[in-house]
């Protein structure tokens, strides 16, 4: 087996860059895209909001509990936003090491698809937060917007956790 392929994402694109560990998304992928007219931080807003939801739902990794305890506390107190946590604690790279096992399983269901491309999260983010904005990148990094997308993420998470949604098609006869 070789080095795994990094699954970096941005809406509408797939990047296959070699890396030592799996990345789900990186803000720097979007620095030379339509996000250019905005400050660079805007490229990490969508990642930070998802990561904040994961932390606030106890899905952060032991790595962050050990190495980012102060930042985790500030995020939980809403002294910083998810994007600010992402920039400071993750060096603008959302990877497997950021979440615990359950968090990574959910990411692989919702944030990325089976091919390692953008998952349903991106459609939810656009529908909930960016539908009336000039672009995906114009979403303001604030707790009001976080609350809106957090409700959508939580719904998807509960659907994913439900035994019925995890049932295989050949198990159609099972009631739960």
Regions found by a protein language model. Give the residues of each.
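N-terminal amphipathic/basic-hydrophobic helices that include classical n-h-c signal peptides
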Residues: 1-21
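Compositionally biased, intrinsically disordered low-complexity regions
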Residues: 8-11, 15, 122, 155, ...
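N-terminal low-complexity, intrinsically disordered segments
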Residues: 20-85
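Polar/charged low-complexity regulatory segments
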Residues: 35-37, 146-149, 153-157
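Intrinsically disordered or highly flexible coil/loop and linker segments, enriched in small
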Residues: 59-63, 95, 99, 116, ...
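Amphipathic protein-protein interaction modules
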Residues: 79-148
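Polybasic, Ser/Thr-rich amphipathic helices
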Residues: 165-176
């Amino acid at each position: 087996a070789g080095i795994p392929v990094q699954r970096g994402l941005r809406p509408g694109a797939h990047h296959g860059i070699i890396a030592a560990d799996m990345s789900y998304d990186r803000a720097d992928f979007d620095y030379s895209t339509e996000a250019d007219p905005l400050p660079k931080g805007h490229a990490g807003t969508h990642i930070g909001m998802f990561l904040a939801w994961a932390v606030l739902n106890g899905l952060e990794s032991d790595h962050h509990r050990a190495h980012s305890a102060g930042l985790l506390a500030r995020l939980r107190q809403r002294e910083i936003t998810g994007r600010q946590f992402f920039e400071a604690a993750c060096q603008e790279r959302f990877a497997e090491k950021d979440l615990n096992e359950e968090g990574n399983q959910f990411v692989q269901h919702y944030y990325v698809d089976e091919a390692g491309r953008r998952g349903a999260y991106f459609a939810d983010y656009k529908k909930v937060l960016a539908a009336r904005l000039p672009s995906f990148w114009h979403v303001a990094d604030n707790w009001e917007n976080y609350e809106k997308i957090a409700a959508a993420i939580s719904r998807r998470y509960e659907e994913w956790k439900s035994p019925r949604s995890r049932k295989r098609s050949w198990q159609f006869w099972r009631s739960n």
